[in-house]
């Protein structure tokens, strides 16, 4: 499963398979704005993450709390609720996600699940825009792997909070315009997730408490010391 976040955000040349971003549920659920970088109908669709980068693919982990078939009598369509320390991911799989569908049918809550998938937005009857995940690769993981993901997702979130205005100024400007803030709040979200990791009675992480506490201090410091400078503006193509 590809999990690295190391990828340039600028330019219009897009690889066939982009690297997955580590994103907490709290941030992904706010990433309701989609865009393309090309008029080509086959161009990838991105969500603008509130922390200021684009994402065509994400890597998430959490506890499965519910698996429900919301399809028709003759066609399965599974909706899976996956919870991380910050919120809920909704994963949907049907006939076009055949391998993921087979695996999801075997899931027994409350197993820990890793998902690499594409974010998709949809509008509800009342006009609310929600975000879900279309899975490309999934797998059951142990609690240690889940804990390491929480730590890594916090690290990646803090990197975006600190550097997105420099490394991806165009998307950072777009995100600020769409969501009305610069994403610095998610440093506090990262801190909350790390504190949850420290407090968890069931935690079996290979990370020692001192390492987690150091990252927690960094998260709290970033949350309290954020540059309010306006990012550079850009026009991108709405999906």
Which positions does each model-derived feature cover?
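OB-fold (S1/OB) nucleic-acid-binding surfaces
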Residues: 69-97, 137, 141
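A general secondary-structure signal for short beta-strands and their flanking turns/coil
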Residues: 55-57, 75-77, 112, 128
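Hydrophobic residues positioned within well-ordered beta-strands of beta-sheet architectures
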Residues: 60, 78-80, 115
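OB/S1-fold single-stranded nucleic-acid-binding modules
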Residues: 1-50, 54, 192-239
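Extended, charge-rich, solvent-exposed interface segments
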Residues: 98-99, 106-112, 118, 124-217, ...
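Structural detector for short beta-strands of small beta-barrel domains
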Residues: 55-74
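Short acidic (Asp/Glu) patches
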Residues: 44, 93-103
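Short, surface-exposed secondary-structure boundary micro-motifs
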Residues: 63, 118-119
């Amino acid at each position: 499963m590809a999990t690295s976040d190391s990828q340039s955000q600028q330019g219009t040349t897009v690889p066939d398979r982009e690297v997955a971003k580590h994103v907490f549920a709290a941030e992904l659920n706010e990433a309701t704005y989609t865009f393309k970088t090309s008029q080509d109908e086959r161009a990838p669709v991105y969500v603008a993450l509130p922390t200021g980068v684009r994402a065509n693919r994400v890597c998430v982990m959490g506890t499965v709390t519910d698996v429900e078939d919301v399809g028709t009598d003759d066609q399965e369509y599974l909706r899976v609720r996956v919870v991380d320390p910050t919120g809920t991911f909704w994963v949907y799989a049907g006939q076009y996600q055949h391998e993921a569908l087979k695996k999801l049918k075997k899931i027994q809550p409350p197993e820990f699940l890793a998902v690499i998938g594409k974010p998709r937005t949809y509008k509800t009857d009342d006009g609310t825009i929600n975000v879900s995940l279309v899975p490309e690769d999934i797998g059951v993981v142990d609690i240690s792997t889940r804990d390491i993901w929480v730590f890594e997702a916090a690290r990646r979130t803090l990197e975006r909070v600190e550097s997105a205005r420099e490394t991806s100024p165009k998307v950072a400007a777009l995100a600020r315009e769409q969501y009305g803030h610069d994403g610095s709040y998610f440093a506090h979200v990262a801190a909350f997730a790390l504190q949850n990791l420290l407090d968890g009675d069931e935690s079996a992480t290979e990370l020692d408490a001192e390492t987690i506490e150091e990252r927690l201090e960094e998260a709290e410091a970033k949350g309290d010391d954020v540059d309010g400078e306006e990012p550079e503006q850009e026009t991108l193509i709405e999906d």
